[in-house]
């Protein structure tokens, strides 16, 4: 504790600002710059976008004119071009959390150069998120619903043969009417989506799902069903609710037939749109940097990028800071972004003198670029690479409170929901 008074305790912004001001001559910048507040930054971004769009509307360069018109047609409304400006703002702000924003953009655009079914987007993002995070819950729902409804039918028809596929059980169709066929289609379609490994399979399963599973009005759909109307209505409500939820969850998929779906994802238009978005975002970035340079103003994100550049390009300065700090203690590590983590890594001693404190459950700054997956990856390292200390003991609450919290967290937190596995290690303990 006696060393606390001499510790260099700062926010990441304050630390980087001091580093940059102390080394302005190495970076080749004017040390008298000022930091913009949020409103100033927003106004300068808006002004830069206005100037950029005005120039592109009037350009005589045919290639640039065509690219800009394509983007306006794709993202702007019939009233104004604010939709396209919003895309540029959002993308620009997002990439600032990476050490090299422009390189990150070009690297991601390059993923679309090859066949889409072989791209990182499809293999890692689409298949992983779509199948594991969205469809797992729905698949379990339909299986449970079918089992429950078959159980009811068996009470009425004890000799029902349940060894055949559900759709082939005549007693179920007789008892539940048309709804039974639709429920079986939903269950099979979700299973097909979960096992899909190609765009053809995804398109076909999704096409079947949206085209053939609308139950219709209760009166018409109930026709010929033997079940009591109240019982039938209960299950039809569950059916319609989950079906609408699944359609909402997969709303990012293009509507239409499997053929249209595949045409979309394999089209050159998709690749061209991505290239054009990168092109105009890079143009904006260059103009925005020039505008800030003229006013001699910077954002805290600029300061972090300058600090990163200083450490990555100057070994002597990097070593100076590395020797200065025996330990690097980072609080709220779950809200660190890729740029900040890279700065910490550069001035550490091969990561061996870093101590990170954080809680994935408290990650609330993704909208500002915080990336909790950085903490998650460190947490998953082998034990010989990192030491993990679990701060799970709670000395301020009664066991009744702790047990209630653990019950709620266990129910709502899993690897599939929230990226947090609330197991016995993560659970709160009294003693």
Mark where each language-model region is.
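Short, conserved catalytic or adaptor-binding loops enriched in Gly and charged residues
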Residues: 1-2, 242-253, 378-384, 431
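Conserved ATP-dependent motor core of P-loop NTPases, especially the RecA-like helicase ATPase domain
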Residues: 1-193, 197
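Conserved helicase NTPase motor core
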Residues: 8-13, 17, 33-46, 83, ...
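Conserved AAA+ ATPase "sensor/coupling" helix adjacent to the nucleotide-binding pocket
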Residues: 23, 48-55, 378, 404-412
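Short coil/turn segments at secondary-structure boundaries
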Residues: 30-35, 58-72, 101-109, 156-172, ...
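Coupling/switch/interface segments within P-loop NTPase motor domains and analogous charged loops
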Residues: 58, 62-86, 100, 174-285
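Helicase-core coupling region on the C-terminal RecA-like lobe
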Residues: 79-86, 90-93, 390-431
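Short amphipathic alpha-helical segments
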Residues: 385-389
């Amino acid at each position: 504790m006696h060393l606390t008074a001499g510790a260099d305790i700062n926010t990441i912004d304050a630390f980087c600002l001091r580093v940059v001001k102390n080394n302005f001559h190495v970076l080749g910048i004017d040390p008298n710059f000022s930091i913009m507040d949020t409103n100033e930054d927003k106004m300068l971004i808006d002004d830069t976008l206005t100037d950029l769009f005005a120039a592109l509307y009037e350009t005589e360069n045919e290639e640039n004119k065509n690219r800009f018109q394509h983007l306006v047609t794709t993202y702007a409304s019939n009233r104004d071009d604010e939709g396209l400006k919003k895309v540029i703002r959002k993308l620009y702000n997002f990439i600032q959390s990476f050490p090299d924003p422009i390189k990150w953009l070009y690297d991601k655009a390059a993923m679309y150069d090859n066949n889409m079914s072989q791209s990182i987007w499809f293999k890692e993002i689409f298949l992983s998120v779509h199948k594991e995070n969205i469809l797992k819950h729905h698949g379990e729902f339909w299986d449970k619903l079918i089992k429950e409804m078959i159980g009811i039918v068996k009470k009425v028809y004890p000799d029902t043969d349940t060894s055949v596929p559900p759709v082939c059980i005549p007693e179920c169709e007789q008892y539940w009417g048309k709804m039974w066929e639709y429920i079986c289609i939903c269950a099979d379609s979700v299973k097909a989506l979960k096992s899909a490994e190609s765009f053809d399979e995804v398109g076909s399963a999704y096409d079947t799902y949206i085209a053939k599973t609308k139950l219709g009005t209760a009166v018409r759909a109930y026709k010929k069903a033997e079940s009591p109307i109240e019982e039938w209505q209960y299950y039809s409500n569950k059916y319609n609710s989950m079906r609408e939820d699944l359609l909402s969850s997969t709303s990012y998929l293009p509507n239409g037939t499997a053929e249209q779906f595949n045409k979309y994802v394999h089209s050159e238009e998709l690749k061209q749109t991505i290239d054009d978005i990168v092109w105009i975002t890079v143009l904006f970035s260059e103009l925005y940097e020039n505008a800030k340079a003229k006013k001699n103003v910077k954002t805290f994100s600029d300061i972090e990028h300058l600090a990163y550049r200083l450490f990555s390009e100057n070994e002597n300065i990097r070593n100076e800071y590395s020797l200065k700090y025996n330990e690097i203690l980072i609080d709220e590590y779950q809200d660190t972004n890729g740029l900040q983590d890279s700065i910490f890594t550069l001035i550490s001693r091969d990561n061996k003198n870093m101590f990170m404190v954080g809680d994935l459950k408290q990650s609330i700054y993704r909208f500002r670029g915080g990336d909790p997956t950085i903490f998650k990856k460190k947490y998953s390292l082998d034990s010989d690479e990192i030491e993990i200390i679990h701060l799970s003991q709670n000395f301020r609450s009664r066991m009744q409170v702790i047990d209630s919290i653990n019950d709620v967290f266990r129910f709502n937190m899993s690897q599939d929901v929230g990226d947090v596995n609330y197991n016995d290690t993560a659970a709160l303990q009294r003693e």
